[in-house]
């Protein structure tokens, strides 16, 4: 029997990737629904009109009276729940929901649920590869890649889901087999009233979870859990009885579980302490669902990282170049600066700037002073970053990513690394962080 009551009317609000997945899901179940989007020409409009010409669609300013016709509004993550039209419809009886809530109702296989301010995609991808190496029929997606509803299949044995705070806002009960908040730092402060509201949204991932994984070194990642709920931990310190961490023997560091060394850190192909933390988090999540260590460690040895996430580009004149364009918040940039900075013999030349989304950049000052030779700044909020850094290092302003690559190459010395880790979104200058990363990679390739 369908878990959706068929005589109720629904509206999908937002026609991007997740909105279109909702359209397919509802249409396949014969549910009555319409579509609304604040944009005059949303990305999937042509697809909707071609494949579902019978579905009513309203584009432009949201019509409250139209929304109030619905018993339930499936709100895409790109639209804030605080939008007045949504709040008015909700006050008049419409339930606000989303695609992840529907996914949770229909998923028959265990779910590994992953969120955090940073490293979500890397850890999600790693766990998915570990599960595949263990012979599991695994589906990976959510905020990363394939929308959640498009993954639903009776053939799937395990779901590995990356979830954003925006998706979790409309998720009442996820019921994951294991859930984690990898870390929390300020992000999306242009959408949330402050860090507490952002923290609460992230922690909705733990609702109904059967096990949790906690970052020992980030108190904000730890949920309030009842007695008896299994809790596994990870961190860059020595592991506890239920934990994964680092051990050192004869000058060599090892990934470890409890009192057992699992593999030398030197066997990882990805560099930096932050990537060691990602590996430990993935091990903890995989262990929670019973993945064997041999398959997980084999996956770790082969993993080369994701594009735009502290991605090594090339070496030139003794200087390594890294593309960390995905670092769209301060926490992500800090992870890269500290992770790479502690792992190289020289200094970093940092390239940062863009749309800061209302963030506080003051946390960058100390690690930049410790690990960086200079900072090259660009984008809308370059001056805000400059004010936060003060006299920590020499500051250079440029107008383009190409100029940033050229100036950084001039500043870097043999043994250094040039790191694009903007601590900002890209929308002031680019379509998305991927385009920013590609432009940087091309500029680095063109250095004479």
Swiss-Prot record:
<feature type="binding site">
    <location>
        <begin position="116"/>
        <end position="122"/>
    </location>
    <ligand>
        <name>ATP</name>
    </ligand>
</feature>
<dbReference type="InterPro" id="IPR036615">
    <property type="entry name" value="Mur_ligase_C_dom_sf"/>
</dbReference>
<comment type="pathway">
    <text>Cell wall biogenesis; peptidoglycan biosynthesis.</text>
</comment>
<dbReference type="InterPro" id="IPR036565">
    <property type="entry name" value="Mur-like_cat_sf"/>
</dbReference>
<comment type="similarity">
    <text>Belongs to the MurCDEF family.</text>
</comment>
<dbReference type="Pfam" id="PF08245">
    <property type="entry name" value="Mur_ligase_M"/>
</dbReference>
<dbReference type="GO" id="GO:0051301">
    <property type="term" value="P:cell division"/>
</dbReference>
<dbReference type="GO" id="GO:0071555">
    <property type="term" value="P:cell wall organization"/>
</dbReference>
<dbReference type="InterPro" id="IPR004101">
    <property type="entry name" value="Mur_ligase_C"/>
</dbReference>
<keyword id="KW-0133">Cell shape</keyword>
<dbReference type="Pfam" id="PF21799">
    <property type="entry name" value="MurD-like_N"/>
</dbReference>
<dbReference type="InterPro" id="IPR013221">
    <property type="entry name" value="Mur_ligase_cen"/>
</dbReference>
<keyword id="KW-0132">Cell division</keyword>
<keyword id="KW-0573">Peptidoglycan synthesis</keyword>
<comment type="function">
    <text>Cell wall formation. Catalyzes the addition of glutamate to the nucleotide precursor UDP-N-acetylmuramoyl-L-alanine (UMA).</text>
</comment>
<dbReference type="GO" id="GO:0009252">
    <property type="term" value="P:peptidoglycan biosynthetic process"/>
</dbReference>
<keyword id="KW-0963">Cytoplasm</keyword>
<keyword id="KW-0067">ATP-binding</keyword>
<keyword id="KW-0547">Nucleotide-binding</keyword>
<keyword id="KW-0131">Cell cycle</keyword>
<keyword id="KW-0961">Cell wall biogenesis/degradation</keyword>
<dbReference type="GO" id="GO:0005737">
    <property type="term" value="C:cytoplasm"/>
</dbReference>
<dbReference type="GO" id="GO:0005524">
    <property type="term" value="F:ATP binding"/>
</dbReference>
<dbReference type="GO" id="GO:0008764">
    <property type="term" value="F:UDP-N-acetylmuramoylalanine-D-glutamate ligase activity"/>
</dbReference>
<dbReference type="InterPro" id="IPR005762">
    <property type="entry name" value="MurD"/>
</dbReference>
<dbReference type="GO" id="GO:0008360">
    <property type="term" value="P:regulation of cell shape"/>
</dbReference>
<dbReference type="Pfam" id="PF02875">
    <property type="entry name" value="Mur_ligase_C"/>
</dbReference>
<keyword id="KW-0436">Ligase</keyword>
<protein>
    <recommendedName>
        <fullName>UDP-N-acetylmuramoylalanine--D-glutamate ligase</fullName>
        <ecNumber>6.3.2.9</ecNumber>
    </recommendedName>
</protein>
